[in-house]
Amino acid sequence: MHGVVLDADSLGPDLDLARLRGQLDHWDWHGQTAPEETANRIREADVVITNKVVLDADAFAAAPHLQLVCVAATGINNIDLDAAREHGVTVCNATGYGTPSVVQHTFALILALATRLPDYQAAVRAGEWSRSPFFCLLDFPITELAGKTLGVIGYGTLGQGVASIARAFGMQVRVAARPGATGIPVDRVAVEDLLEQADVLTLHCPLTDATRGLIGRAELERMKPAALLVNTARGGIVDEAALADALRAGAIGGAGMDVLTQEPPRDGNPLLADDIPNLIVTPHSAWGSHAARQRLVEQVADHIADFRAGRPGNVVAGPEGT
């Protein structure tokens, strides 16, 4: 079988790929693939691995031998699943590989925002501590998390992991009902109510029609003035212009964003302005520990092996209409 990797550079240069390479006899490895290159590169492929390269209907139509697409990520919005089904192609995604790393990163953002770590570090580097008449600086308000309420939207393994750490800090945890769902389970609260209750709101839901723009201007206005918002889920869930305005106006207390609507943000982004207080933007790196990336590669290798053995796993679309 002939395999094609479309964006190997997105996995980093420091991984052990021996087991993955051993799954197929012939590979074409591409560090990056531009949209106009995709169809030609997969024309002879039986198996394609993509992280973020888009496979649309034209790409599937151009690949008559294609049997399996392995998405080297959890999100699958770069794959036309209907086209995959139409062409009898099985699509598998990867899950769970980054959970410890994303949970760690999420809570690192929460702690940094609550303690105003970037602001105090900048003040020290600017010499403000050296010039202080006292032994400390107290220029920025520090929030103690114990007793505060963590609101979670998206309560899969990531949301549950962050909630577990929050409880260890003495926080109360409240979980939103699934956006777009009818009815609210007894152990959940409506998103609208959670916005008003949460001192820290953390997002771990997928980007769907129900969650696109979920946190917009009206939702930010419902949040507490000192509330913190953290998004390590997907860009597009938060209205970035509205968030920038809310932070400048002091409508909420701070925000940590590991994802943006366009990545990388080549055309600029409202959240990249340098006048926004208590905002931390990280470059979609929450998932990026070596351990997480190696687990991802091993999982993709498993998917290929399982497919060849006739028992594909983590199937999100298949010729049987999955």
Model-identified regions with their sequence ranges:
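N-terminal glycine-/charge-rich "phosphate-binding" loop or analogous flexible N-terminal tail
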Residues: M1-V47, G170, R174
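Rossmann-like dinucleotide-binding domain for NAD(H)/NADP(H)
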Residues: V91, A226, T232-T322
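Hydrophobic/small residue at the entry helix of a nucleotide-binding pocket
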Residues: L158
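Short beta->alpha connector loops at strand-helix junctions that form conserved
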Residues: A72-A73, V89-P100, A177, A233
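Rossmann-like adenosine-cofactor binding region
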Residues: D56-A61, Q172, R178-P270
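Phosphate-binding beta-alpha-beta segment of Rossmann-like dinucleotide-binding domains, i.e.
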Residues: H87, T95-T149
